[in-house]
Amino acid sequence: MKYHLYDENYNHKGDFQSLQEMRNYLCEWKYDNDDRTYMHDTFDYIKSIRWHWDITE
């Protein structure tokens, strides 16, 4: 499966081969943007920043 990540304006942010890759990208994004909120669940965090994701096989 491939995970696709989009920001709040549906601009494509990246494609990831695994959920862990997508989570790592989000962790780097949080660090770069000085976001100090806790990310317990990847999908809840994506929702909290108003981003979107999709999966293709």
Where are these regions (language model features)?
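Short, mixed-charge low-complexity intrinsically disordered segments
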Residues: 29-57
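Short aromatic-glycine-(Arg/Gly/Cys) micro-motifs in beta-strand/loop hairpins
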Residues: 1-10, 21, 29-31
